[in-house]
Swiss-Prot record:
Keyword Cytoplasm: yes
Naturally occurring in which organism (per UniProt): Aquifex aeolicus (strain VF5)
Protein name as annotated: Imidazole glycerol phosphate synthase subunit HisH
Cellular localisation: Cytoplasm
Sorted UniProt keywords: Amino-acid biosynthesis, Cytoplasm, Glutamine amidotransferase, Histidine biosynthesis, Hydrolase, Lyase
Subunit structure: Heterodimer of HisH and HisF.
Catalytic function, reaction form: 5-[(5-phospho-1-deoxy-D-ribulos-1-ylimino)methylamino]-1-(5-phospho-beta-D-ribosyl)imidazole-4-carboxamide + L-glutamine = D-erythro-1-(imidazol-4-yl)glycerol 3-phosphate + 5-amino-1-(5-phospho-beta-D-ribosyl)imidazole-4-carboxamide + L-glutamate + H(+); L-glutamine + H2O = L-glutamate + NH4(+)
């Protein structure tokens, strides 16, 4: 099972790849080559930074169609932080920008009246049962760094929510796609458990 962490110039990917290796992903490659990404069994899209810049970089690297095709084929996909937001149709971060459009919905600023960006530990509240959440309990803490939140059209994709001024979507799951607004690689044991659970799901999808 070959896992490719997509490097599109948005953030330090070493901690993500090391966390994946730590939970037993057998072959983890960090690459910005669309040919390498197109042959992956598992794709991981991490990232921090601006939505518009991210989409521009993905397009210039010919990775947009690779990501869409990978997901359409039913192969395992993991999005982290900006990698969750990019799955949606559009974002209003510094203007209006089109996303990958895998999921219907948009990306908007966190609510007024809270400190932005949202940095630090916060709790997960479960919205549905999933193997991804095995070994975790309601109220467990994970680590966030973000200013924007996703608003899915279809609430059934929502895996967890988190309270920051009001409840926002902190993770989603739809078939072969799992994505976290928080950083599992920075969330210590709970984060590694989530990645381990994703690995188990990925193994089922690739055998």
């Amino acid at each position: 099972m070959r896992t490719v962490v997509i490097d599109y110039g948005m953030g330090n990917l070493r901690s993500v790849s090391k966390a994946l290796e730590a939970v037993g992903f057998p072959e983890v490659v960090v690459s910005n080559d669309y040919r390498v990404a197109s042959e992956a069994d598992v794709l991981v899209l991490p990232g921090v930074g601006a939505f518009g810049d991210a989409m521009k970089n993905l397009e210039e690297l010919n990775l947009v169609s690779v990501i869409r095709r990978h997901i359409e084929k039913g192969k395992p996909f993991l999005g982290i932080c900006l990698g969750l937001q990019l799955l949606f149709e559009k974002s209003y971060e510094h203007g209006e920008h089109r996303g990958l459009g895998i999921l219907k919905g948009e990306v908007i600023l966190l609510p007024l009246g809270v400190k932005i960006p949202h940095i630090g530990w916060n709790q997960l509240w479960f919205k549905k049962e999933s193997e991804i959440l095995e070994g975790l309990k309601e109220g467990d803490f994970v680590y966030f760094v973000h200013s924007y939140r996703v608003v899915p059209e279809d609430e059934s994709v929502v895996l967890t929510k988190t309270d920051y001024g009001e409840y926002f979507v902190s993770s989603i799951e739809l078939d072969n796609v799992v994505a976290f607004q928080f950083h599992p690689e920075k969330s210590q044991k709970k984060g590694l458990k989530l990645l381990e659970n994703f690995k188990r799901k990925a193994e089922k999808l690739t055998t």
